[in-house]
Structures are given as C-alpha cells and as structure tokens.
Amino acid sequence: HAGGTDLLGCLRDGVLSAGAVVSLSGLSNLRGIEKNGTGGLKIGALTTLSEVARHPRIMESYGALARAASEVASPQLRNQGTLGGNLCQKPRCWYYRGDFHCLRKGGLQCFAVGGENAYHCILGGENCYIVHPSDTAPALAALEAKVHVEGPKGKRVVAVDGFFVLPEKDFTHETVLGPGELVTHIELPAPVQGLRSSYRKVRARRSWDFALAGLALALVFDGPTVKAARVVLSGAAPVPWRSRETEVAIVGKPLDEAAIAKAAEAVVSGARPRSGNEYKIALFKGVMTEQLSAMAG
C-alpha cells in the first residue's frame, strides 16, 4: 500500500482480505515532484496530496490538479494519502462496502438499481452503478496526464483516459493494473500557451466528502476563442467521464452566453439517472455554467 487510507478501510469493511500487507513507503524513488525532459512534470506515485496541492509549479501551470488535490478529504488525510492511491482507490458504493453480495463481489445484481441510489452514477452505468471517487483523476485526465506502471512483465505507460475500466468490460477491476503491477509515477505534459484549467467539486458536506458532481476543465484559448478543450466529470460515472459532447459545443467559439448554455445542456447528454439521483443533472448543468462563465471572465 501507499498511504493506506483506502486500503485499511477496505480491509476493515471486508471488501478486501490479505494475508500480509506490504508498505511501499520505503521506496523513496516513487516520491517527489520534478521536471521531466519535455517541459512537463513527473510526480511520484507516493507523493502526498498535500504536496501536490501546494507545489508552486502545479499551482501555476496545472491549476485543475492543485485544486483537485486540495479538495480531497481532510487535511489529515491529504497529508497521508498519495496521488497514486487516489487514482487506484476502490469505489465508495455503500452496497459494495457493506454486507451486500453485489455484482462487483461476485453476486447476481447491483442493489443500486432498485435501492437507495442518490450518490450513484448517471452516465456509463451498465448493470453496476458505482461512481469513481477520485478528485485528482478527472483533473489529470483533463490535463492529458499519463500513468507509468511497472510490474513482472516490465514497464508501460497508460494515458489517464485509458487507465480506468467500465463495469461493462470488467465488474471486478477499476483500473487496467494487472497482478503485481504498481503505479510508479504520473507524468504531466508541458503546458501549452493559452491553457487555463480548473476543478470544481460539489459535495453534501462542506467539511469533507466525495463529489456529488465535479468538473475538471482544461481549455486552450486563442484570444477569446476556445482552441481546444478537455472536459472530464467526477461523481457522474464509474470512471472519470470525458464529455466530448461538451468539448464539441465550445471548441472554435468564444465563451459567450449561447455557447455556455449549449455546453450546459451537452454535459448531461446521454444521462440515465436512477430513481434517486436525477438532481445530479441540474448540478452538472449548474457547475458547467459556473465554471465556463468564470473562464470567460
């Protein structure tokens, strides 16, 4: 384990079992933030969320990530939790974490379908309606980060976009990590001219909580016109959800009132809310309007 903040909870809840728990904390080469060879940044998987949130270069050039890291849990947990662990954490679904023998634990059904589902997904659910709990993953996906993985078969690099697995492909895994593999570091590309990024999180409690609705934006401006865009949602789907419909709605246009209104409608395109979470549609529309308006200003 890295920081262990999620693993220990999973062991306590019976979601995972282990004959032994191995700490990675002694691997100093997996810790720290440094420049890479192309003008970007290399962030070790064991770097704490607090370190990510307050790093001057991240705050200046990768604002969405700094903000997302600062929004995770509480100060105590950010001091212990790591960036790699935040990417690889297990779902927070109360059926999965509870005593229910659901699909993800080898059962026959997702209990969120007919049960309490206020915090479950509105996009990408296919028989399993978890939401991915990470705040940093959407920000990293928006910023086109890559995950470096090492294991028994060697090293490989995976775009954050392709690191997570939808339930329709595999009920039992949240990421593409194989047996014996671990995340060594995350790499951010050099920021391009005109890049502005942000992360906004809506939660039930002001103190700390997981996202009901979250939005990571990375827009490249040429004057007032949006030249390129990556829009990624948290709290919406079993994986960090890239809203390509929203990107199409704003690229090539200035962020005027009409473009923002179109983007707000596009962000929930294809949404299929359950009985108790239709409110998320209004939340995502509101967050999109708020964040695009702020960037336009």
PLM regions and their residue ranges:
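C-terminal structural segment of proteins
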Residues: H1-G297
